Amino acid sequence: MTSLVYAAKGIRILGIDPGLRITGFGIVEKIGNRLVYIGSGCVVTGESGLPDRLKTILDGLNEIILQHKPEQVAVEQVFVNINPKSTLLLGQARGAAISAAVLHELSVYEYTALQVKQAVVGNGHARKEQVQEMVMRLLGLGERPRPDAADALACAICHAHGGTGLLTLSARNRSKRSKRL
């Protein structure tokens, strides 16, 4: 008699914490009610001009998507800063990050920093160190990830815990709309 063994199929989630200088990324896989750490890091843009920085973000995330093959993407939303110029620049970095996901026809989910912190720490006003500590514990990491990578992992964890996000850009819906045109 032959027994069949089925591998548990998880959902691979790429979390992104967009930034013009440093864009954090983190990949987790949700298998049942478990979260498995896949990888994390940062795309560093340097001091070049805005178009070059945006291209670095797009290219860096494109490479990460090709390498890790996520099925869904969770992105932290921009908070309105005191400085409107900074808010607009950060929005452009987010646009580059979302574009990388959309180019691969991935579903994109957005979460506020408050939602992410609430989901991961239990306190929407948690400090960065608290987020890093909880990410380390939840994923069984040996050390705290860099702040930007920790925020990206926290965003992925928030999504994995069932957050629906404020805005969903579904690849399926986009393809349906394009067929109607």
From Swiss-Prot:
Enzyme class: hydrolase
GO cellular component, one term: cytoplasm
InterPro entries: RNaseH-like_sf (IPR012337), RNaseH_sf (IPR036397), X-over_junc_endoDNase_Mg_BS (IPR020563), X-over_junc_endoDNase_RuvC (IPR002176)
Active site: 17, 76, 148
Catalytic activity, EC: 3.1.21.10
Record bears the keyword Metal-binding: yes
GO MF assignments: crossover junction DNA endonuclease activity; DNA binding; magnesium ion binding
Subcellular location: Cytoplasm
Biological process according to GO: DNA recombination; DNA repair
Binding site for Mg(2+) 1: 17, 148
Binding positions for Mg(2+) 2 per the UniProt entry: 76
Cofactor, free-text remark: Binds 2 Mg(2+) ion per subunit.
Requisite cofactors: Mg(2+)
Subunit-level organization: Homodimer which binds Holliday junction (HJ) DNA. The HJ becomes 2-fold symmetrical on binding to RuvC with unstacked arms; it has a different conformation from HJ DNA in complex with RuvA. In the full resolvosome a probable DNA-RuvA(4)-RuvB(12)-RuvC(2) complex forms which resolves the HJ.
Similarity annotation: Belongs to the RuvC family.
Protein name per Swiss-Prot or TrEMBL: Crossover junction endodeoxyribonuclease RuvC
Organism: Nitrosomonas europaea (strain ATCC 19718 / CIP 103999 / KCTC 2705 / NBRC 14298)
Species classification: Bacteria, Pseudomonadati, Pseudomonadota, Betaproteobacteria, Nitrosomonadales
